[in-house]
Amino acid sequence: MRLRLFLAASALALLSGCAGLTSHEALEGQGDAQTWKTHKQQLSELDAWQIDGKVGIRAPRDSGSGTLFWLQRQGYYDIRLSGPLGRGAARLTGREGAVSLEVAGQGRYQAESPEALLEQQLGWRLPVSHLLWWVRGLPAPDSKSRLTLDADSRLARLEQDGWQIEYTRYAEQNGYWLPERLKLHGQDLDITLVIKDWQPRQLGR
Protein backbone atom coordinates (compact mmCIF):
# COMPACT_ATOMS: atom_id res chain seq x y z
CA MET A 1 0.00 0.00 0.00
CA ARG A 2 2.77 2.42 0.91
CA LEU A 3 4.52 1.65 -2.37
CA ARG A 4 1.32 2.43 -4.30
CA LEU A 5 0.89 5.72 -2.47
CA PHE A 6 4.52 6.63 -3.13
CA LEU A 7 4.18 5.86 -6.85
CA ALA A 8 0.93 7.82 -7.09
CA ALA A 9 2.48 10.82 -5.36
CA SER A 10 5.51 10.65 -7.62
CA ALA A 11 3.32 10.56 -10.71
CA LEU A 12 1.33 13.58 -9.53
CA ALA A 13 4.53 15.50 -8.84
CA LEU A 14 5.81 14.70 -12.31
CA LEU A 15 2.55 15.79 -13.94
CA SER A 16 2.44 19.04 -12.00
CA GLY A 17 6.03 19.75 -12.99
CA CYS A 18 5.10 19.39 -16.67
CA ALA A 19 1.88 21.38 -16.39
CA GLY A 20 3.47 24.33 -18.17
CA LEU A 21 4.13 22.18 -21.24
CA THR A 22 1.23 22.19 -23.67
CA SER A 23 0.13 19.15 -25.65
CA HIS A 24 1.50 20.95 -28.72
CA GLU A 25 5.10 20.82 -27.44
CA ALA A 26 7.63 18.01 -27.93
CA LEU A 27 10.58 18.66 -25.63
CA GLU A 28 14.16 17.54 -26.26
CA GLY A 29 17.69 18.52 -25.27
CA GLN A 30 19.68 18.80 -22.07
CA GLY A 31 17.54 21.33 -20.22
CA ASP A 32 15.18 20.77 -17.30
CA ALA A 33 11.41 20.73 -17.96
CA GLN A 34 10.50 22.50 -14.71
CA THR A 35 13.06 25.27 -15.28
CA TRP A 36 11.77 25.70 -18.84
CA LYS A 37 8.21 25.92 -17.50
CA THR A 38 9.18 28.77 -15.16
CA HIS A 39 11.17 30.57 -17.86
CA LYS A 40 8.31 30.19 -20.35
CA GLN A 41 5.74 31.54 -17.90
CA GLN A 42 7.85 34.62 -17.19
CA LEU A 43 8.36 35.43 -20.87
CA SER A 44 4.71 34.77 -21.73
CA GLU A 45 3.74 37.62 -19.42
CA LEU A 46 6.04 39.99 -21.30
CA ASP A 47 3.64 42.03 -23.46
CA ALA A 48 5.66 45.10 -24.44
CA TRP A 49 9.16 45.77 -25.70
CA GLN A 50 11.39 47.90 -27.85
CA ILE A 51 14.06 46.25 -29.98
CA ASP A 52 16.91 47.77 -31.95
CA GLY A 53 19.13 45.56 -34.06
CA LYS A 54 20.18 44.30 -37.45
CA VAL A 55 18.45 41.97 -39.86
CA GLY A 56 19.75 39.91 -42.76
CA ILE A 57 17.31 38.47 -45.31
CA ARG A 58 17.81 35.90 -48.06
CA ALA A 59 14.88 35.44 -50.43
CA PRO A 60 14.67 33.66 -53.81
CA ARG A 61 14.80 36.85 -55.85
CA ASP A 62 16.93 39.10 -53.67
CA SER A 63 18.84 39.38 -50.42
CA GLY A 64 20.40 42.02 -48.22
CA SER A 65 20.73 43.45 -44.73
CA GLY A 66 19.49 46.45 -42.80
CA THR A 67 18.44 47.78 -39.43
CA LEU A 68 15.45 46.73 -37.35
CA PHE A 69 13.27 48.71 -34.94
CA TRP A 70 10.38 46.91 -33.24
CA LEU A 71 7.95 48.54 -30.82
CA GLN A 72 5.40 46.23 -29.21
CA ARG A 73 2.59 47.43 -26.92
CA GLN A 74 0.40 44.44 -26.11
CA GLY A 75 -1.62 43.79 -29.31
CA TYR A 76 -0.17 46.74 -31.25
CA TYR A 77 3.13 46.53 -33.13
CA ASP A 78 5.31 48.93 -35.10
CA ILE A 79 8.11 47.15 -37.00
CA ARG A 80 10.49 49.19 -39.14
CA LEU A 81 13.13 47.92 -41.54
CA SER A 82 15.56 50.20 -43.27
CA GLY A 83 17.99 49.22 -45.97
CA PRO A 84 17.27 45.54 -46.75
CA LEU A 85 17.11 44.39 -50.34
CA GLY A 86 17.60 47.87 -51.73
CA ARG A 87 13.99 48.79 -50.95
CA GLY A 88 14.81 51.71 -48.69
CA ALA A 89 12.56 51.75 -45.63
CA ALA A 90 9.51 49.62 -44.82
CA ARG A 91 7.17 50.00 -41.85
CA LEU A 92 4.64 47.42 -40.70
CA THR A 93 2.09 48.59 -38.12
CA GLY A 94 -1.15 47.25 -36.80
CA ARG A 95 -3.11 45.00 -34.52
CA GLU A 96 -5.35 42.01 -35.07
CA GLY A 97 -7.60 42.58 -38.09
CA ALA A 98 -6.05 45.86 -39.26
CA VAL A 99 -2.51 46.00 -40.64
CA SER A 100 -0.68 48.63 -42.67
CA LEU A 101 2.57 48.43 -44.65
CA GLU A 102 4.42 51.51 -45.87
CA VAL A 103 7.23 51.03 -48.38
CA ALA A 104 9.42 54.00 -49.29
CA GLY A 105 8.78 55.17 -52.82
CA GLN A 106 5.90 52.73 -53.35
CA GLY A 107 3.07 53.73 -51.07
CA ARG A 108 0.89 52.43 -48.27
CA TYR A 109 -1.00 49.15 -48.29
CA GLN A 110 -3.55 47.59 -45.95
CA ALA A 111 -4.80 44.10 -45.18
CA GLU A 112 -6.38 42.09 -42.39
CA SER A 113 -3.22 40.10 -41.60
CA PRO A 114 0.50 40.92 -41.69
CA GLU A 115 1.22 37.60 -43.41
CA ALA A 116 -1.05 38.41 -46.37
CA LEU A 117 0.34 41.93 -46.65
CA LEU A 118 4.00 40.91 -46.71
CA GLU A 119 3.39 38.16 -49.24
CA GLN A 120 1.37 40.43 -51.52
CA GLN A 121 3.75 43.38 -51.48
CA LEU A 122 7.21 41.92 -50.79
CA GLY A 123 6.80 38.28 -51.78
CA TRP A 124 7.82 37.06 -48.31
CA ARG A 125 6.02 34.15 -46.63
CA LEU A 126 6.74 35.15 -43.05
CA PRO A 127 4.54 34.15 -40.06
CA VAL A 128 4.60 37.53 -38.32
CA SER A 129 2.06 36.37 -35.72
CA HIS A 130 4.50 33.62 -34.72
CA LEU A 131 7.40 36.08 -34.64
CA LEU A 132 5.77 37.80 -31.65
CA TRP A 133 6.57 34.60 -29.74
CA TRP A 134 9.74 33.47 -31.47
CA VAL A 135 11.57 36.73 -30.83
CA ARG A 136 11.09 36.18 -27.07
CA GLY A 137 12.45 32.63 -27.31
CA LEU A 138 9.03 30.96 -27.11
CA PRO A 139 6.99 28.69 -29.38
CA ALA A 140 3.73 30.11 -30.70
CA PRO A 141 1.00 28.52 -28.56
CA ASP A 142 -1.58 27.50 -31.18
CA SER A 143 0.29 24.92 -33.26
CA LYS A 144 2.59 21.94 -32.75
CA SER A 145 6.26 22.57 -32.05
CA ARG A 146 9.45 20.63 -31.36
CA LEU A 147 11.72 22.26 -28.79
CA THR A 148 15.38 21.60 -28.08
CA LEU A 149 16.61 23.12 -24.82
CA ASP A 150 20.16 24.20 -24.05
CA ALA A 151 22.01 23.54 -20.78
CA ASP A 152 20.32 26.60 -19.23
CA SER A 153 16.83 25.30 -20.13
CA ARG A 154 16.29 27.97 -22.76
CA LEU A 155 15.44 27.36 -26.40
CA ALA A 156 18.37 26.29 -28.54
CA ARG A 157 16.24 25.20 -31.49
CA LEU A 158 12.57 25.41 -32.39
CA GLU A 159 10.70 23.68 -35.21
CA GLN A 160 7.20 24.94 -35.92
CA ASP A 161 4.91 25.16 -38.96
CA GLY A 162 7.67 24.45 -41.46
CA TRP A 163 10.18 26.85 -39.87
CA GLN A 164 13.39 26.12 -37.98
CA ILE A 165 14.66 28.73 -35.54
CA GLU A 166 18.13 28.54 -34.01
CA TYR A 167 18.97 30.56 -30.89
CA THR A 168 22.70 31.10 -30.59
CA ARG A 169 22.99 33.82 -27.95
CA TYR A 170 21.00 35.16 -24.99
CA ALA A 171 21.44 38.12 -22.66
CA GLU A 172 19.72 39.22 -19.46
CA GLN A 173 17.69 42.42 -19.62
CA ASN A 174 15.69 43.66 -16.62
CA GLY A 175 15.48 40.16 -15.19
CA TYR A 176 14.51 38.47 -18.47
CA TRP A 177 16.79 36.15 -20.43
CA LEU A 178 16.07 37.12 -24.04
CA PRO A 179 17.52 36.10 -27.42
CA GLU A 180 20.24 38.32 -28.85
CA ARG A 181 20.92 36.31 -31.98
CA LEU A 182 18.58 33.99 -33.85
CA LYS A 183 18.35 32.45 -37.30
CA LEU A 184 15.06 31.62 -38.96
CA HIS A 185 14.88 29.15 -41.84
CA GLY A 186 11.70 28.88 -43.91
CA GLN A 187 10.87 27.19 -47.18
CA ASP A 188 12.01 30.12 -49.31
CA LEU A 189 13.19 32.69 -46.78
CA ASP A 190 16.15 32.87 -44.38
CA ILE A 191 16.38 35.59 -41.74
CA THR A 192 19.12 36.42 -39.25
CA LEU A 193 18.29 38.74 -36.35
CA VAL A 194 20.97 40.34 -34.20
CA ILE A 195 19.39 42.33 -31.38
CA LYS A 196 21.60 45.09 -30.03
CA ASP A 197 19.18 46.56 -27.50
CA TRP A 198 16.26 44.92 -25.68
CA GLN A 199 13.87 47.01 -23.57
CA PRO A 200 11.28 44.57 -22.18
CA ARG A 201 8.21 45.66 -20.19
CA GLN A 202 5.01 44.30 -18.70
CA LEU A 203 1.98 46.53 -19.29
CA GLY A 204 -0.71 44.05 -18.28
CA ARG A 205 0.05 44.18 -14.58
Swiss-Prot record:
Subcellular location: Cell outer membrane
CC terms in the record's Gene Ontology section: cell outer membrane
Entry keyword Signal: yes
Keyword Protein transport: yes
Keywords assigned: Cell outer membrane, Chaperone, Lipoprotein, Membrane, Palmitate, Protein transport, Signal, Transport
Classification via PROSITE patterns: PROKAR_LIPOPROTEIN
Lipid moiety-binding residues (S-diacylglycerol cysteine): 18
Main subcellular location: membrane
InterPro entries: LolA/LolB/LppX, OM_lipoprot_LolB
N-palmitoyl cysteine lipid sites: 18
GO BP of this protein: lipoprotein localization to outer membrane; protein transport
Family listed: Belongs to the LolB family.
Subunit description: Monomer.
Function text: Plays a critical role in the incorporation of lipoproteins in the outer membrane after they are released by the LolA protein.
The protein's name in its UniProt record: Outer-membrane lipoprotein LolB
Organism ancestry: Bacteria, Pseudomonadati, Pseudomonadota, Gammaproteobacteria, Pseudomonadales
Record gene name: lolB
